[in-house]
Regions:
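Extracytoplasmic
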Residues: 50-91
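Surface-exposed alpha-helical segments enriched in charged/polar residues
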Residues: 46-50, 116
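Generic, low-specificity signal for short hydrophobic/alpha-helical stretches with a mild N-terminal bias
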Residues: 26-30, 73, 111
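Generic detector of short, locally flexible boundary/turn motifs and exposed helical patches
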Residues: 22-27, 56-61, 93-95
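Aromatic/acidic, Gly/Pro-rich catalytic loop(s) in extracytoplasmic/lumenal soluble domains
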Residues: 76-140
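A short linear-motif detector with a strong N-terminal bias
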Residues: 37-38, 69-72, 106-109
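Membrane-proximal, lumen/periplasm-facing interface regions of secretory-pathway glyco-
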Residues: 1-46, 63-68
Length: 140
């Protein structure tokens, strides 16, 4: 129905029909809720550009290549460092279960705290975690 179009915009790729219970039902059943980086919207990039401190180090897991592309295109600030291996300030996770194999190890770190999220009807599409630098440095 037309109502669904309004609710899901701009996340149409996350659509599930009402037979499965919409996106909430799909999420509860373990189905994918994001696919092709569609949750990294211009609004989300604007949020990162405005809210993250200068020279922040970002690990976007399997999405790092997309963040590097956004930097090349001028959609993401150039002072951000995108990394996969070094210590990071922010961990950005696209909620794509099939591509999240190494993520549990990272998310089990005690120095990570939820900083922000992009949600669709209470289902997280993107999660942004911030490193608690005091705990992180104390543990080194």
């Amino acid at each position: 129905p037309a109502t669904d179009l309004v609710v899901y915009h701009p996340y149409e790729l996350s659509y599930y029909n009402r037979l499965v219970g919409g996106i909430r039902g799909a999420y509860q059943r373990g189905l994918e809720v994001t696919y092709f980086m569609e949750a990294f919207t211009p609004d989300f990039m604007d949020f990162l550009n405005k809210k993250l401190p200068q020279n922040s180090v970002i690990n976007a897991s399997f999405s790092n290549f997309m963040f590097e592309y956004y930097q090349e295109e001028g959609r993401l600030r150039q002072d951000f460092r995108i990394t996969e291996k070094e210590d990071f300030d922010y961990y950005i996770l696209l909620n794509r279960r099939s591509a999240s194999s190494g993520v549990k190890r990272v998310l089990s770190r005690e120095d990570l705290k939820t900083y922000a999220s992009v949600q669709l009807t209470s289902v997280p599409l993107v999660l942004v975690y911030k490193t608690d630098t005091q705990n992180s440095k104390a543990g080194k």
